[in-house]
Amino acid sequence: MSEKLDEVDSKSLDEINGSIKVPKNAGFWKTLMAYSGPGFLIAVGYMDPGNWITSIAGGAQFRYTLLSVILLSSLIAMLLQAMSARLGIVTGKDLAQLTRERTSKRVGFLLWIVAELAIMATDIAEIIGSGIALELLFHIPLIIGILITAADVLILLLLMKLGFRKIEAIVATLVAVILIVFAYEVLLSDPSISGIIKGYVPSVEILGNNSMLYLSLGIVGATVMPHDLYLGSSISQTREVDRKDRENVAQAIRFSTIDSNMQLFLAFIVNSLLLILGAALFYGTDSSLGRFVDLFNALSNNQIVGAIASPVLSMLFAVALLASGQSSTITGTLSGQIIMEGFIRLRVPLWVQRLVTRVLSVAPVLIFAIYYHGDEAKIENLLTFSQVFLSVALPFAVIPLVIYTSSKKLMGEFANRAWVKWCAWTATIVLILLNIYLILQTLGLIK
């Protein structure tokens, strides 16, 4: 079925690999329940604090037009994450392990450094989002909030001891909080249903408007997260699979793909709700919505959002922001462990790995916070730069993924079919070109 892989390596996330039993000869729904869970962890990366400002600003500036961009981005994400899960299930290796085995030492070292920096960039967005949420909810000084957020490594260490199913349940709960909050706020905002439906139809207007195109690139560039591709290839292996049994492998691929697509559909709904909220409440206003604090204040200002304005809406927004940040903590930690163990085969205690990654991520945020005396606007600029770097890092994960899943020598009969390969390479090239354009425009090198 696939070529023999290096057996001296330990399994990906060894402590939870194959730890969840799947009932044999069970019905569709019972089997789906057994495979459900990893998709929630994947979906978190598609609704983290780094995506919020772009989606809401897109609605505020261009109403519902950019909903089609969110739809396209979500379809690309579903394709790549399905390939990531397939890779892990068929080979029994994660993307980091395979990349190390199949590249030279120099290339492997470069890819490892980029992957580690991507984890740090993801952490920065989570730290800033959580720190600001704590300030908004409890009036904790931002610097103190950042330090509290940094200490959440202890939370994850406790969760890992409870078992992977418990982690999945906690993340699912946090995702549900985010979904419910924004669904409620959108219902109150009374959006245009016809405008929403029309917004999902791609418009050539986007290509002819520089501001609209720039925001579109931001949405696409922030959608597929590099660390999620490493994560997906690993946590797809948490279910017990007999790789000598073709039917068992095919079943695992099928249900893991369904789980991933279901949860990414939820992420698509959340991102759509963010844009719809921006369109329904802020379109046509002169308010600045480039910061979390601006959005928080606007939701309780009846001169901006009208009669529905209330402190409750603002508080719910901050609660959702905190839930988004904390759920990212879990996935960031697991991704960091996968990357470190896979690329350099360095098995260190989880608390050491997490602490090192966390300190490196907190340091620039803390330095910014102290230097600018807790000025949220300046600190959120760092969040923007972290998202730009994730765009830079994306091809370094996507290209190996497409190559490996298209290899019949590696994947056997489960290699990408011709149409999947064509779609994957097309999506990859589009993502790379869009990200290059976004980076150049962000740096002011093109107008």
Swiss-Prot record:
Main location: membrane
GO molecular function (one): manganese ion transmembrane transporter activity
GO biological process: iron ion transmembrane transport
Superkingdom in the source lineage: Bacteria
Subcellular localization: Cell membrane
Topology of the protein relative to the lipid bilayer: Multi-pass membrane protein
Family: Belongs to the NRAMP family.
HAMAP family noted in UniProt: NRAMP
Designated name of the protein: Divalent metal cation transporter MntH
Source organism: Pediococcus pentosaceus (strain ATCC 25745 / CCUG 21536 / LMG 10740 / 183-1w)
